[in-house]
Each structure stands twice: as structure tokens, then as C-alpha cells.
Amino acid sequence: MNDLCTDIGYRSLNHDGEQLCGDHIDIVEQDDDSIVVVLADGLGSGVKASILSTLTSKIISTMMAAGMKIEDCVSTIAATLPVCSVRGVAYSTFTILRFVQNREAEIIQYDNPHVILLRDGQNYEYPRTVMNIDGKEIYSSRITLRENDIFIAMSDGCIHAGVGMKLNFGWERKDIINFMEPFANVGFTAKTLDTILLDECNKLYDGHPGDDTTACVVRIRRREPMNLLIGPPSNPDDCSKMMSLFFSKEGKHIVCGGTTSSIAAEFLHKPLVPTVDYPDPEIPPIARIEGVDLVTEGVITINKVLKYAQDYLADNESYTQWSYKKDGASQIARLLFEEATDINFYVGRAVNPAHQNPNLPINFNIKMRLVDELSTCLKQMGKRIKVSYF
């Protein structure tokens, strides 16, 4: 076992005028350090394509979750998928990325654009072996992983972007490589890299995609622990225990809440220094405690972080806000979304008397709900989450 992990981001653009996407992505965790990503592209667009791509990805991911070999999965799906009598091609193509113990990647590709691998900021031509299964050419590759490797899987909507419009022959694979290479060493998350790629595809389509367009980016990175403390414990006698556990953990430490930060400052025997800067008038200012990486207000700030997290999982349109702003919510978002891989929440159950004012839209249940919903969003981002209550 090593300290590498996978950071995964994906997004789709629907064919112009269609409610459903004809591409589908399934992600299956086999264990803590092995994961399978399946991208399927159904023939055509609309409902039929959506059903066929979903069927393809579900069959492959389900078989792999059951422990079957990749060759068996490929053989089954290749033999199962029919070939269109008119077009002479399979009803659904697929790309499989399997990361084993965060040490090796297995790539299986059938009729989708070949996966791009960026290594050390440049395109890396990995070896491919051709398998012939039931008359279908399947490309297979095995690659030893390195930190900062970036895999880009895509449907043919990406390489068709701009065809007959801004580009005569579409956005070819080599063009996508040239476009993405400058972003490889910047440190962007997989989701951000994926958003950059899909936004460019959408521009080439002039906002009216002529095909379902999907990209999935997987970035290999080292694990980074993060710790967030919010709320004092329900039993005041547990303050020392809660603080000892929190500050003993490896990684950066975030303290949220006025009372909580006062307790943390007392525990560390350091002064709590408030700031008067309001980078965002909607978010209370941060404070500073020596030995703590970030000190913020509680419920209002976390509520904003939750909104950013929900948007991040959707279209990531708020990225341009939280990626550079200096308010507490934006700083927490950068730490949790971009830096952290393993996040420990320490949640105090004490009731804040100030929140019991019936004229305020804040109460104890809202604080618990915010933590639960934020934890769920972070899990969907692929983070390992542990929540401890006091």
C-alpha cells in the first residue's frame, strides 16, 4: 500500500435539444485502494442512447464489483452489444479505467477516443495491446502509476467539437492534448481540469453541442489529511478531550465558530485575534490563532461552503468565486475541495443560546444538517470522511 490516491472529476454536455445524455459514467470502488471507472457512449442521442450507455456501464461495473476479471467483463459486454444494421457499429462503445491498489492502471478501450495520459506535464504514449474478442478490436494497456499522472477519458463528442463550424475536422485528439498540457502542472483538481475541457468543447460547439459530450479526468495524487472542528461539546468537561484529539491529528486544522475558537485558543494558550476585513459582506470575517491554519465563523460560513460543494458536484460554475476569494467560506472550500483527500470532522453538540432566538433562521438541527450534507457532498467528491460527535 502507498499514499497515492485517485482524484476523479467528470461532466457531460447533452446533445442540443435532448433532455437525456447518451453517455454514461459509472464508478465502482472494489476496496479502499482500487476503483473502476466506466465511460459508455450510446449510439446516437436521446433516450435510446441513454438507455444503452447506462446498460453498458452498469453491466461492466456490476461484473467487476463481483470480482470478475476484466477480460471476462469485456468479453461479455462485447458479445452482448448488438451492431447497428444500418451503421455497422456497436450500439455502445466504452472505456474502462481500473486503478489497482493505487499502483497500476489498467485501460480497456473499445471504439472511444483513446485515453490521454499526461505525465510530467506532457503527453505520454503508453503501450497498447490489441485483443480481438468476437470480431471486435479491444485495446488493453497496463501502466505503473506515478504521482501527478493525469488520465483523460472522453466520448467522441469531444473530438467532434467544432466540426463544420469553427473547425473543419473537429477538435482532434492531438489538439485536445495541446490544449490540456499547459494545465497539467498547475495543481488543478480533476473536476477543475474536466470543467476546463468541457467548457472549451461547449465554446467550439457555440453552446449547441452536436453530439453528447463527456469527459472524465483522473488525477493521481498523494493523500492529504484535513481536520475541521465546529461547535463546543455538549458536556463542557469534554472540551480538553475534544481539543486533544483534534490537534493530535496529522494535517491542517480548521476551527469554525466563535465559542469553538475561544475554546481552541484557551487550549493552545494562544490569543484569539479577530480581523476586521470583510472580503465578502455576506460572510463574517475570519480570525487568527497561532497553531491553527484557519479560524472562521460557524453556521453562516459552513452554509456557504455547502452551497459551493453542491455547485462543485453539478456544473462547478461557482469555481471562479471561491477559487481566489479570501473570505472564510472560500478558504474552507479550497482546503476541502482541492487540498484534502481525508477529512476528519469534530462536531460539538452543545446548543448555542444565540441560535435559539425565534427571529433567527438558525438552530441546533440546522447545524447538524449542514455537517451531514457537507459530509455527503465531500464523499461524492471521493473524499474519505470521518465524523466524530462530542
List each model region and its residues.
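Primarily the active-site beta-strand->alpha-helix module of PP2C/PPM metal-dependent phosphatases
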Residues: H24-T80, I152, G164-I176
